[in-house]
Amino acid sequence: MPITIGNGFLKSEILTNSPRNTKEAWWKVLWEKIKDFFFSTGKAKADRCLHEMLFAERAPTRERLTEIFFELKELACASQRDRFQVHNPHENDATIILRIMDQNEENELLRITQNTDTFSCEVMGNLYFLMKDRPDILKSHPQMTAMIKRRYSEIVDYPLPSTLCLNPAGAPILSVPLDNIEGYLYTELRKGHLDGWKAQEKATYLAAKIQSGIEKTTRILHHANISESTQQNAFLETMAMCGLKQLEIPPPHTHIPIEKMVKEVLLADKTFQAFLVTDPSTSQSMLAEIVEAISDQVFHAIFRIDPQAIQKMAEEQLTTLHVRSEQQSGCLCCFL
């Protein structure tokens, strides 16, 4: 029985996994070949990244593998970063290859191949594991599955969402191009506004995620009557954990949020528009779910931060503060 890994729009099943003793032998040879790519201060973290990739109890998801590759690239000396290469053999988003080349740039030391529904990891030509992705079911439209393909973007030095694939039951797959998301970022770059846009969007997007987590937990614990002050404290403490301050000045009217970019790109596609019209009862909730999923991936590609993890942090923070408040109230009642 295959092991299922991951959540969200993609779940993975292990098809092939090498024995641990074989993995250890390959890892030792790999580490000897690449350890000098890193400064002494980065070697320990690079070693941990490789261990997570190759020895984790559960094989990393597609997204985590991508993160590890780019973390290793960031840790490498500037003179060695050219060895960390992203290759699109078909010049589309059907296949992305992330690879580390040897000193002569002739042989692949590490290769991560990501196809539409499978991804694999090879060490010096030896297959470490092969995983199969299966699209997740849309919560708002249970008769449909969704998958978001990605293509490497030089602007963010990370794969960005490039195609949305929707598969309605008993109907052909609907492919919606998302390339114009990168176009928005390129426009900001060309104007010289990209850094300012990023600083503004990071704070705005995460604040919205934190607020969403607070509201979600408040709804779940509606019987507990969580006070406004507890909710506000949870919001501020989560913002502080993320190194953010509460926004005193709203974004300028020229600022285009990620969610607006994504929505405009989706609705610019006439086929997608027509598809929404065919089922008006669920179209808005489905659109909102898809926009959030794509936006989260765009944000993650730009900032290397998982917005869902931040939202979860806010949920846990509110629960913790509420429980603490209840305990203190109980102690006070006992004292009185």
UniProtKB/Swiss-Prot annotation:
Keyword terms of this UniProt record: Host cell membrane, Host cytoplasm, Host membrane, Membrane, Secreted, Virulence
Main location, first listed in the record: secreted
Stimuli inducing this protein: Very highly expressed in host macrophages and when grown in an acidic environment; repressed by H-NS and induced by SsrB. Repressed in conditions of high calcium and by osmotic stress.
GO cellular component: extracellular region; host cell cytoplasm; host cell plasma membrane; membrane
Localization per Swiss-Prot or TrEMBL: Secreted; Host cytoplasm; Host cell membrane
Quaternary structure (record): Interacts with host PLEKHM2. Interacts with SseJ; the interaction is indirect.
Free-text note regarding domains: Domains throughout the protein, and not only the N-terminus, are required for secretion and translocation. Both N- and C-terminal domains are also required for formation of tubules.
Role: Effector proteins function to alter host cell physiology and promote bacterial survival in host tissues. This protein is required for endosomal tubulation and formation of Salmonella-induced filaments (Sifs), which are filamentous structures containing lysosomal membrane glycoproteins within epithelial cells. Sif formation is concomitant with intracellular bacterial replication.
Family note: Belongs to the Sif family.
Protein name: Secreted effector protein SifA
Protein species of origin: Salmonella typhimurium (strain LT2 / SGSC1412 / ATCC 700720)
Source species taxonomy: Bacteria, Pseudomonadati, Pseudomonadota, Gammaproteobacteria, Enterobacterales
